[in-house]
Amino acid sequence: MMNQTYTAVLADDEPLLRHHLNKLLAELWPALEIVASAENGQIALQAIEQHQPDVVFLDIRMPKMDGIEVARRLLQQPKVPLVVFITAYDEYAVSAFETHAIDYLLKPLSSSRLASCCEKLQQQLRRNVAPSNDLAQLMSQFEQLTRTVKPQYQVWLKASKGEEIHLIAVNELLYVKAEDKYLSLYKVHGATTHEYLLRSSLKELLAQLDPNQFWQIHRSIVVNVGKIDKVTRDFGGKMWVHIDRLQLPVSRALQHLFKVS
C-alpha cells in the first residue's frame, strides 16, 4: 500500500509556484501522479471533473474563479477529493483551516511543511477518509467570514520586466494601463518611471485593489489616487489627470469622479 499510486491536480495562477510545487512533490511523494496543472479556477474545476483526482492543491486567490468557489463546487460532485489550500498568510483563513482539520500550505512553500502535508494526506487516503463533511463546514465558515470581515486587498503584485520577476508594492504604483492581453504597471524608481508587465485583465486586477485607492478613469487606465498631482480640463471639455509629468485622459463617463460637490 505504501507505493500505491494516487492522482492530483495543482491549481495556482503563478507558473513558478506550480513548477516549484510539482518538483517538490516529485521528491517527497514520487507515487503521486500529477494529472493536470491549472492557472485559474475555471480550468482547475474542468480538470478535476475530467480526472477525478484523489488530491487537489488549490490556491485561494486565482482569476476567473477563486479556490474557495472551486472547493464549494467540488462538494456537489460524487467523489470529493482531499483538498489542500495554498495561501499567503491570512489569520482568518488559517484559523478556519485549523478548526476544520483542512490542510493548507503557506507561501512561500516550505519543503518540510509540504512533507508533513503529504504524510497526512497518505494516511487519510489509506484510511479512505471522506473529506466532504470537514470541507462543507469550512465553506460555511468562509461564507460567514466574507459577510463580516473587511475585504483583504493585494499589497504586492508580481510582474515581469524583461526576463526578471519583480515584487511591486501597490502603494508605489502610479497607474496601470491595459495593453492587449497584458497590463502595463508604472512606478517611479529614482528619477525614472519604469514599466512592468502583468498577465491579467483590468477587471481581474481591480477586484484585487482597494477601490478607495485605485480609480478607473478610462476603459484602459486605472490610477493610484494618492499619486495624482492635479486634474485639468482643456478648451474642448476633455479632462486630464496629471501624474508624474504625464497626462492621462479621463473618459466622459467617469468625469464625475472628480466633480466637486
From Swiss-Prot:
GO BP annotations, alphabetical order: regulation of DNA-templated transcription
4-aspartylphosphate: residues carrying this PTM: 54
Cysteines engaged in disulfide bonds, as pairs: none
Matching Pfam families: LytTR, Response_reg
Protein origin, superkingdom: Bacteria
Gene3D superfamilies: 3.40.50.2300, LytTr DNA-binding domain
Domain annotation HTH LytTR-type: ranges: 157-261
Transmembrane regions listed in the UniProt entry: none
Name of this chain's protein: Uncharacterized response regulatory protein VC_A0850
Origin species: Vibrio cholerae serotype O1 (strain ATCC 39315 / El Tor Inaba N16961)
